[in-house]
Amino acid sequence: MDPLNESTVNVYLPDSYLKGVISFSETNAIGSCLLKRPYLKNDNTAKVAIENPVIEHVRLKNAVNSKMKISDYKVVEPVNMQHEIMKNVHSCELTLLKQFLTRSKNISTLKLNMICDWLQLKSTSDDTSILSFIDVEFIPSWVSNWFSNWYNLNKLILEFRREEVIRTGSILCRSLGKLVFIVSSYGCIVKSNKSKRVSFFTYNQLLTWKDVMLSRFNANFCIWVSNSLNENQEGLGLRSNLQGMLTNKLYETVDYMLSLCCNEGFSLVKEFEGFIMSEILRITEHAQFSTRFRNTLLNGLTDQLTKLKNKNRLRVHSTVLENNDYPMYEVVLKLLGDTLRCIKLLINKNLENAAELYYIFRIFGHPMVDERDAMDAVKLNNEITKILRLESLTELRGAFILRIIKGFVDNNKRWPKIKNLKVLSKRWTMYFKAKNYPSQLELSEQDFLELAAIQFEQEFSVPEKTNLEMVLNDKAISPPKRLIWSVYPKNYLPETIKNRYLEETFNASDSLKTRRVLEYYLKDNKFDQKELKSYVVRQEYLNDKEHIVSLTGKERELSVGRMFAMQPGKQRQIQILAEKLLADNIVPFFPETLTKYGDLDLQRIMEIKSELSSIKTRRNDSYNNYIARASIVTDLSKFNQAFRYETTAICADVADELHGTQSLFCWLHLIVPMTTMICAYRHAPPETKGEYDIDKIEEQSGLYRYHMGGIEGWCQKLWTMEAISLLDVVSVKTRCQMTSLLNGDNQSIDVSKPVKLSEGLDEVKADYRLAVKMLKEIRDAYRNIGHKLKEGETYISRDLQFISKVIQSEGVMHPTPIKKVLRVGPWINTILDDIKTSAESIGSLCQELEFRGESIIVSLILRNFWLYNLYMHESKQHPLAGKQLFKQLNKTLTSVQRFFEIKRENEVVDLWMNIPMQFGGGDPVVFYRSFYRRTPDFLTEAISHVDILLKISANIKNETKVSFFKALLSIEKNERATLTTLMRDPQAVGSERQAKVTSDINRTAVTSILSLSPNQLFSDSAIHYSRNEEEVGIIAENITPVYPHGLRVLYESLPFHKAEKVVNMISGTKSITNLLQRTSAINGEDIDRAVSMMLENLGLLSRILSVVVDSIEIPIKSNGRLICCQISRTLRETSWNNMEIVGVTSPSITTCMDVIYATSSHLKGIIIEKFSTDRTTRGQRGPKSPWVGSSTQEKKLVPVYNRQILSKQQREQLEAIGKMRWVYKGTPGLRRLLNKICLGSLGISYKCVKPLLPRFMSVNFLHRLSVSSRPMEFPASVPAYRTTNYHFDTSPINQALSERFGNEDINLVFQNAISCGISIMSVVEQLTGRSPKQLVLIPQLEEIDIMPPPVFQGKFNYKLVDKITSDQHIFSPDKIDMLTLGKMLMPTIKGQKTDQFLNKRENYFHGNNLIESLSAALACHWCGILTEQCIENNIFKKDWGDGFISDHAFMDFKIFLCVFKTKLLCSWGSQGKNIKDEDIVDESIDKLLRIDNTFWRMFSKVMFEPKVKKRIMLYDVKFLSLVGYIGFKNWFIEQLRSAELHEIPWIVNAEGDLVEIKSIKIYLQLIEQSLFLRITVLNYTDMAHALTRLIRKKLMCDNALLTPISSPMVNLTQVIDPTTQLDYFPKITFERLKNYDTSSNYAKGKLTRNYMILLPWQHVNRYNFVFSSTGCKVSLKTCIGKLMKDLNPKVLYFIGEGAGNWMARTACEYPDIKFVYRSLKDDLDHHYPLEYQRVIGELSRIIDSGEGLSMETTDATQKTHWDLIHRVSKDALLITLCDAEFKDRDDFFKMVILWRKHVLSCRICTTYGTDLYLFAKYHAKDCNVKLPFFVRSVATFIMQGSKLSGSECYILLTLGHHNSLPCHGEIQNSKMKIAVCNDFYAAKKLDNKSIEANCKSLLSGLRIPINKKELDRQRRLLTLQSNHSSVATVGGSKIIESKWLTNKASTIIDWLEHILNSPKGELNYDFFEALENTYPNMIKLIDNLGNAEIKKLIKVTGYMLVSKK
């Protein structure tokens, strides 16, 4: 924008630089200039265009005057001509169309034959191809007319483009039929001689018309082809069956309607979508769902209709068009009715059709958009008064805050820091302390209001330096306010402004004049990386005078007031910063936002979501409630503009607090109202009246101030998060489950809620009721914060998902393939009309017709139709290259004809069109792509393609086929391909040169531009980049073999790959041309280069075929086919110059697998079978059953550390270094290289970084790096197939492959096998009309060639690494300092349990190696005492060591010493000297000698304790002879000198921050230098605390003692008499089975009586016991009293005991016996004899209670348990009693076997021979089970107190000849017998204390006796909702919600009342059954109470029944 040269300033940018938008103002300007009267609207544009038109319009005017007479023609607007232009069939191109189609069929035949050959589908004898269903002779007119129309208009445009290339700014005049066109790039005219009308429009309008014709042709062509195929064989064509005649009628009706209604008519077209939506709802939903929506919609349409005429008349007032007549309301209404009828007929009740039509509306053209109008609409929206509800806003803020808290807890295991904790209630403070949050169910609105008051402290920070990621945002920006006039053509501005503007630009810096963010930085010579932060911190952006918001037309929907706003670069960077901070720090807490997902992710998410909500999967919940579900899709009107400061700030403030900023996140709301909003569209200048400062210009259309709302696209992320929080609130209020996906205002919400169905409420009604209720709630919620739901675009459905325009119903996604191919045509998506890119676009777009099991044939026909057109027709006259392309193509074809010796020219073309582009053919879609889409290796695939192609070409000789591959292999080496090209894709044969050339062009262009950049950062980096890029190759130049991916990895691990990003970004086609020249024109040199590139590409095949070296050997398989894999490898290795390159080949499934349709499963292959039984599965889509297939990334283990701390760059750098280590593993010198790279980029040594690096696990580097893995696009559409080999590890083929390749990563070969198999199923079904039931893919071993990983030789050249890393500028990642490293390596204790990957060595103190942890902690503890003592002496008044004496007895003294030494060094070595010196170590040890002797006295006192002494003796026997503390001191110091260093546990506080910072720094230095130490952390405040926790964590006690113990524990003095205690136990009833039938066919239960009971009545007589009550069920004296008498044991061993109740009973029965007690130290159960202590009163009779044992040693299934069983008691295990609950039978047997092993090997037990018994609990199984060898069962006891339905029994086992265990049947049988014949005994005495404890734990405050009065009192308590009782204990579990409490409590009270009122009866099952049957609310009782609670309830019930009079 150089102001001195007027011509460059005033570049005419036509509206075509805005994609797809047709500018109203420009059209108006053109017309007004030509007519000298306002054209479309009388506004300022018309005025300036008449007075001072731009020079281009004047030229156009002159041309018109000379070439066309328009004076007597009627002037109309462009849309009025649309109907006539579309119907203007000038010449019929039917013959051309037939030619293209015929050729397309021939070319497709070859491809089809290839498919059939590979799939082994033989054609039948009459040999008619399916392609013959497409009859070229009968192409309907509704296809051919569109082709002719498009062809003619396209010809005109191409002719114009050719002219323009020769002479810029040329004007072309041509007539087409009855129309005459004048075309120029800055305005066009059409004149109709038929209707005597004339119209003016922009070049874009013409292009749009051309595209519309093309789209209509493509749509109709697909419809016709598909229907012809489907008529003859169902399933060949597409799934939709639209009617071409009708689509044609639809186009015509709409065109006619638009031609009458002018531009305003498009507002009707916009409503069609809604109409189709209502049709879709009518198909998928029940009437009540769709009617409402339909009515709203039709009302909307008629509303629009009534407004049309007024709108139009208002606009054309006092213009040329004023007198044109406007149609009557009735006329338009009739046309509208026709259109809708047409749509309805087209849809024909078929969802596929509806989905397809939903998109077809791009086929009617685009409206012209009036920018000023759109802007006025924005202005109006923002002036609306909003009424906001404060409470709603507060709830919204609370929900937002809760999300952040949840996010912190989930990610960082803590809450964010809070300033004002006191605003929280007790309950929330509890969560805060517990570092947790409540579940959704526990929340209420009140909580949100409470949380809203929280204020956070800063958790994240604004980056210090401007980050490259920000600079690389290539966004558009506006000129600053004083230069805003640069936007408009200078002619349009008054003189005064022009002059002042010249002055201003002259003084302005370059960076202010640009319109892109990137250039704003590039051209800034004062750029300072730290500036942005100070700009933010000082908040200058809030008062910046240069701020301006300019709105331009960018969106298609401008008509409804969506504007695209731009602001100057300085402010734009603030916004980029805010967005980036949100995206990095806060968006992760809101997973529902779709802003962060790519397309494939989205597709997967949608598939999962629709699968979940599908009607077919609706279920009832466990309480048999129907789960009502509905889905709501909302669209909010003017979502962005409805946000005001008030609504944004409530959440923005929270974000500000977290980032420590002020108003950074809603700054726009603070500043925009003070700013002028101006319409910055070129042809819409404001009326200035000569005023330069736009703040002083009066408001007018297109310029206003005081903009209140948000601006489209500016705070999207924040607003989306607010919307999510709002839905959180709604969900809590309605107690509904909501799943939502949101993207700004477009929300898809699923709601579900259980309901009870009743008479009038069926499932549909329940769903509907829920949907309406929720919609109302959502609407109200939005209304309260000032938003309005759009009626026409908000709908509810039971099962229809619709988001970002993808329709899914019943869990099935409806692909809309036609939509995707509307745009296919020649020269698409190219700037320089490159033939190769264009062909690739055609290929990939047409493939959309194949994916998801659509039609492969339609895809082939359409693709080849356009490719043939492109190559054989369009290339004859290329706008840039003239005839050169066609000549080159002819040469190539001739060489093909000669080489393959083909007679007919057509066959040559067919063949060439099927040779893949990689070899210079014409086929952009390699064969494999129709079957699987992730390719490991293009080259192999291309070779396989050619192999199959030549196989089916019958007219080519075999020798020729082989010689083709020889020619391929004899391709000459490429001299110019160096490392640079390796950086790109080394896959295709011709690509090296191309890659080299393009990358050269880009690099030179960009680096030269960058190096001239005034911005120091960029210029330095450009020079650095160009200098160093080649040198990277040198680093690894001596390493062989050369390995492209390795080089790539090396390249990326050197930090300047960020520089490459800049280069690539700038060299992207668009921006490079913009940089090279100011306009979007392209210069001659570019054109020449592009043309020569195209010629090179087209000539590749003839170059390949020109040389054939006959001596080359071609590898051939036994069956005569080639081995493609090897050819590919050889080719790749030989086509590079002087490098031994490792071939990264990977087999192609198309050649390495044979497809066999067989049902025998013994075939060694991969089996894929169909899941459904239908003959075909077309149409019913979606896997409803297991779907197999996954897209795998390389597996890597990421070490566990706190990743939050690192920046994104640091994480990327670590990843790159990890990859580097992985690839070059084992290469000499690798460590040094890595060390240099680490120091250069991260600033710390490799050694320290090592624990942070990810570790890759795959064996085969080669493939893992080269397999690019993309998920298949299949899942939701193909019918469900499954594969029997979920993994190939088990498949028989695996054997064969493993034998051949060793244990290599074979799965790689099969990466694609499954998705391929599924596609095959689908394709076979299309081609044959039936679906194979099963197919097997059999690998051919010769073809599978897995490379071993390369063994690298040679050394790295380090010298350059220093140079490259020291040259770093903006690109180097941040350095990591040692302290951060320390923080990162600290997994908190909590994190460990969950992480399954946690390597045992990663964190040394993980609590499982107790001895080591203990020793280390003790050593640290003593060191702590030492350092404390050095600081202050008085600490030793109390003996510190004593508390831990017993712990010292278990330590490992060696570790103790090592840790002591290391810790000492860290505490004392902090004098700042270098740690390396040995002296420092000695110094700190010498210092010990001088330490006060009080310490040594104390220390030695502990160490000389007898048990500790024994332990130390193991380390050094000399210890025995030491006397006195002096001797100890000398000995200890001597030992210390020789000790090694060792890792230390460090202490952190509750926040997770380190406590001893100084020492830690030294420790980190130690790590860096020598040791292989790891950092470990314990989160406690001091070592003594940590120590106790460590040990107690292993012991039991901490959770059992929390339960309130109501027992006589307090007065332990009175010794309780055991025999009297026995009366509290009830008498026991049992049956003893001695000999029993063990056959498994034992009929189940011979008794007919079967009790139907729901409650655990076996607890009825156990009311005297609280914690456990096994003793009420089983008794030693009653069961095996005789045995006890015989053996007379002194000690009984109870293992697997819980709270020790059985032991207590035994203690009462045998007062003299002592006990050994073992219980599994599991957190879930008691591991302390609590009940025993309660009953007996003290523990003196338990001689070994398992104190101090770890978890393994208390687990009876572990050997260590039995080894330590005699650690105290030296008595034999005469009788061992086991009451353990084992997970499964195996564990029971483990225990038995270990018991047997023990008693047969232990020297104490063996003295008793075989007279040892095990009395154990066992759950019988159905089958016959043998006991382990040499263990026999003597008797089985069935207890009355066991669960009735279970199969629990107690067996007495001894040593002897093994026999069988009883089976389920007999146990059941004798259980029933006992149940029928016996009553339960009640205990003789009642223990009131226990009963009271039971009552209280059941219902707090329940007292005994339980009578009517007591229950009434309880009821009264319930109704008084007092605060303090809201937290109470019910059955031992805390319950917070008072509602639940009342629910549970009232349930309990009801039951107790029922018991109170029932009669007294005998305690037997008949009576219990009667009790249950007479109680009406059984189900409620069982649903509301947990297991434990029910047991308590039965105990209390038993007490009530017993105490009845």
Curated annotation (Swiss-Prot):
Residue ranges of every copy of the RdRp catalytic domain listed in the record: 628-811
Location(s) in or outside the cell: Virion; Host cytoplasm
Keywords annotated in UniProt: ATP-binding, Host cytoplasm, Hydrolase, Magnesium, Metal-binding, Methyltransferase, mRNA capping, mRNA processing, Multifunctional enzyme, Nucleotide-binding, Nucleotidyltransferase, RNA-directed RNA polymerase, S-adenosyl-L-methionine, Transferase, Viral RNA replication, Virion
Effect of substituting G1700A: Impaired cell-cell spread and/or viral replication. 70-80% reduction in N-protein expression. Loss of 2'-O methylation activity but not G-N-7 methylation activity
Region entry GDP polyribonucleotidyltransferase, spans: 902-1379
A GO cellular component annotation in the UniProt record: host cell cytoplasm
Keyword Chaperone annotated: no
Outcome of mutating D1755A: Impaired cell-cell spread and/or viral replication. 50-70% reduction in N-protein expression. Loss of 2'-O methylation activity but not G-N-7 methylation activity
EC number: 2.7.7.48, 3.6.1.-, 2.7.7.88, 2.1.1.375
Residues reported in the UniProt entry to bind substrate: G1696, E1697, G1698, A1699, G1700
Record: active site: H1263, K1673, D1779, K1817, E1848
UniProt-annotated binding residues for Mg(2+): D635, D745
Transmembrane portions of the chain: none
Domain Mononegavirus-type SAM-dependent 2'-O-MTase residue range list: 1662-1852
Reactions the enzyme catalyzes: RNA(n) + a ribonucleoside 5'-triphosphate = RNA(n+1) + diphosphate; GTP + H2O = GDP + phosphate + H(+); a 5'-end triphospho-adenylyl-adenylyl-cytidylyl-adenosine in mRNA + GDP + H(+) = a 5'-end (5'-triphosphoguanosine)-adenylyl-adenylyl-cytidylyl-adenosine in mRNA + diphosphate; a 5'-end (5'-triphosphoguanosine)-adenylyl-adenylyl-cytidylyl-adenosine in mRNA + 2 S-adenosyl-L-methionine = a 5'-end (N(7)-methyl 5'-triphosphoguanosine)-(2'-O-methyladenylyl)-adenylyl-cytidylyl-adenosine in mRNA + 2 S-adenosyl-L-homocysteine + H(+)
Pfam families linked to this entry: Methyltrans_Mon_2nd, Mononeg_mRNAcap, Mononeg_RNA_pol
Cofactor: Mg(2+)
Function of the protein: Responsible for RNA synthesis (replicase and transcriptase), cap addition, and cap methylation. Also performs the polyadenylation of subgenomic mRNAs by a stuttering mechanism at a slipery stop site present at the end of viral genes. The template is composed of the viral RNA tightly encapsidated by the nucleoprotein (N). The viral polymerase binds to the genomic RNA at two different sites in the 3' leader promoter thereby initiating either genome replication or mRNA transcription.
UniProt free text on domains: Contains an RNA-dependent RNA polymerase (RdRp) domain, a polyribonucleotidyl transferase (PRNTase or capping) domain and a methyltransferase (MTase) domain.
Membership in a protein family: Belongs to the paramyxovirus L protein family.
Name this polypeptide is given: RNA-directed RNA polymerase L
Organism name: Human metapneumovirus (strain CAN97-83)
